[in-house]
A protein has these predicted regions:
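Structured, non-membrane catalytic/scaffold regions adjacent to prosthetic-group chemistry
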Residues: 109, 132-136, 151-155, 246-573
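Membrane-embedded alpha-helical segments of integral membrane proteins
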Residues: 81-105, 109-174
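Intrinsically disordered, low-complexity terminal tails and inter-domain linkers enriched
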Residues: 8-9, 163-215
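Hydrophobic alpha-helical membrane-embedded or membrane-associated segments
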Residues: 21-32, 91, 95, 119-122, ...
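C-terminal region of N-terminal signal peptides and the immediate post-cleavage residues
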Residues: 41-46, 237-257
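Membrane-water interface at transmembrane helix exits
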Residues: 36, 40, 70, 102-106, ...
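N-terminal secretory signal peptides and thylakoid transit peptides that target proteins
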Residues: 209-231
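Membrane-anchoring hydrophobic segments
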Residues: 1-112
Length: 573
């Protein structure tokens, strides 16, 4: 009697090709991201693992990296927004690389790929749990993300391996083939070679070891449909999570409160001659859509005014809890203020002016009773971002520090802090201009360190006397002869006394100033210059109302603002 060996012992176990293994892994990672985002949209948008990791990068990144990010530019995006897109895309690229590696190592052992899914998922869970706004329910999204990734990885890997094995699960094929050959040998001896119970090569339409049950083999089309379903589901889940996360109808909330933002202490009307827009300067009031935006928020916190509340606590005699209605019921102020970002380079455009409506922050602090020794007003935003403001500055009677609810006659735009933000004239935004305000604590500098202070920036950051050249622009070619130069200057709380310009290092020439609106706003300047043909360099400098001349010493933005004379090069023909 001859011996028939099982054919499975003659063949190597099926193995995924590298492209198939990578595709399986990438789709599984996409499913994990999508499901995590979807569940976060239902439970709490900040608990999306993808966003939480990005937030953690912002939270723990060194100052140099943050400044590099803010300096990035992308077509169609203003400065201060390209860094957010770049970070999110960068995290996506890193995830893609990890997914590719996980796919390749899973060719030998599928469980190794799943372990990578778990490790990445646990990293996302850690990012969620270390968020300053963490709540226990936030763990649901990262756990769902891990579960979805594991399921998708195992399911797709099994299907791809089945196809590689000829359409039937590898284990079943090997077991069935063995029994079929042995049964065929026994059948040869007993009934002429037919075995009704163990189909072999003669009956490929039935599953190996199927016990008489028929099944269709897996085809490439089946696998592609399964992969497409996972991919489309991942994208759909991600989009769904985004839409659910934006579920707060901010526009409806803004429309509801708009009629009530009516200042009882209005600012003066802007006088004629307050700008030289005809000569190339900005308009005096910056439209809301053009107002500069610099912040760390990857996803803007959205909250309806009816749901907003804030606590003033810490080193105070009486803790205050305020709703949006409480603010509206207080005397409303209206102040025109020029705001400046500390990241503004010499000659930069991170400066804007608006009419802000709100309540006196000083009055609230006096009502709470700030205790002696409280040196810092520590403010926190809805997304956990923190700012430290010198308490003595906020309490100055003439400073007009405000909790702002309106901007240029409208409710605050969402991207500029709706429902409530802080504005303290004369201080750079990083120590004063908390958006999406959620909490105020009177404390000391030793007790609390804000986001920027931990990165080596200054506690005290009054805005420096600076100027900018708006016309001509860098690289312009103008007609030789009488050339109009124009620009802006600012020294908030001190005001601008004069601006001078010089051509090619020559004598300083005084410029004509626009009408002053108040000491907290910029002033425009314009001057006629006699410019011969050739290449030229133009510089400007300002003097504030205290007589302090703008410094020529060059300084970077860190730790308390850039300085130096603005300079542009142009040609005349």
């Amino acid at each position: 009697m001859s011996t028939v060996l099982p054919r499975s012992s003659e063949q190597a176990p099926p193995r995924l090709s590298a492209p198939a293994a990578v595709a399986v892994s990438v789709l599984a990672f996409a499913a994990a991201v999508g499901v995590g985002h979807l569940v976060a949209g239902i439970v709490a948008p900040p608990s999306s693992p993808y966003q939480a990791v990005a937030d953690a990068v912002v939270r723990y990144a060194p100052s140099e990296l943050v400044e590099f990010g803010k300096s990035l530019s992308l077509p169609g995006l203003p400065r201060g927004q390209a860094d957010k897109v770049g970070l999110l895309v960068g995290i996506g690229v890193v995830l893609l690389v990890i997914a590719i590696v996980a796919g390749l190592i899973s060719r030998e052992h599928e469980r190794l790929g799943r372990r990578v899914v778990v490790m990445v998922g646990l990293f996302g869970l850690a990012a969620v749990c270390t968020s300053p706004v963490f709540a226990l329910a936030d763990v649901v999204a990262p756990l769902a993300s891990i579960g979805a990734g594991l399921w998708a990885f195992r399911w797709l890997h099994h299907k791809a391996l089945t196809l590689a094995a000829g359409g039937f699960p590898p284990g079943a094929q090997r077991a069935g083939s063995g029994r079929g050959d042995a049964g065929r040998a026994a059948g040869d001896a007993e009934d002429g070679g037919h075995s009704a119970e163990s189909p072999g090569e003669d009956d490929p339409g039935r599953p190996p070891g199927g016990g008489g049950h028929s099944a269709e083999p897996l085809t490439r089309r089946n696998l592609l449909v399964s992969g497409a379903a996972v991919g489309v589901g991942a994208v759909g889940a991600g989009v769904g999570g985004y839409l659910l996360g934006a579920g707060v109808d901010v526009a409806a909330s803004q429309a509801q409160v708009a009629p009530e933002i009516k200042p009882r202490s209005p600012a003066r009307l802007i006088p004629s001659g307050a700008d030289f827009a005809f000569a190339g300067t900005p308009t005096f009031i910056t439209p809301n859509k053009d107002f500069y935006r610099i912040d760390t928020a990857l996803r803007i916190p959205a909250q309806a005014a009816a749901d907003w509340s804030m606590r003033i606590h810490g080193m105070v005699n009486r803790e205050l809890r305020l709703s949006f209605r409480d603010l509206l019921d207080r005397p409303m102020l209206d102040r025109v203020v020029t705001m400046t970002c500390v990241s503004n380079e010499v000659g930069g455009n991170l400066i804007s002016t608006a009419r802000f409506s709100g309540v006196s922050l000083r009055d609230l602090l006096v009502e709470a009773g700030v205790q002696p020794g409280a040196s810092q007003l520590y403010s926190t935003s809805l997304d956990g971002f923190s700012v430290g403001t010198p308490m003595d500055v906020v309490l100055e009677p003439d400073r007009d520090a405000m909790l702002v609810v309106g901007m240029n006659g409208e409710p605050l735009p969402l991207e500029h802090g709706y429902p409530v933000r802080m504005v303290v004239p004369g201080l750079y935004g990083f120590v004063s201009a908390t958006k999406w305000l959620a909490d105020l604590e009177a404390t000391t500098w030793d007790a609390r360190q804000s986001y920027w202070l931990r990165r080596g920036w200054a506690r005290q950051a009054p805005i420096k006397t600076e100027s900018r050249i708006d016309q001509p622009r860098e690289g312009d070619t103008v007609t030789a002869g009488q050339v109009t130069a124009a620009g802006i200057a600012w020294a908030q709380t001190r005001g601008i006394r004069g601006v001078e310009v010089r051509l090619d290092g020559g004598e300083w020439q005084p410029a004509r100033l626009s009408t002053e609106v108040n000491k907290d706003t910029w002033r425009m300047w314009v001057v006629k210059l006699s410019v011969p043909p050739g290449k030229h360099t133009l510089q400007a400098r300002a003097t504030d109302d205290t007589g302090q001349l703008q410094t020529a010493a060059h300084a970077r933005p860190i730790p308390d603002g850039a300085s130096g004379y603005p300079s542009i090069s142009f040609a005349a023909t």
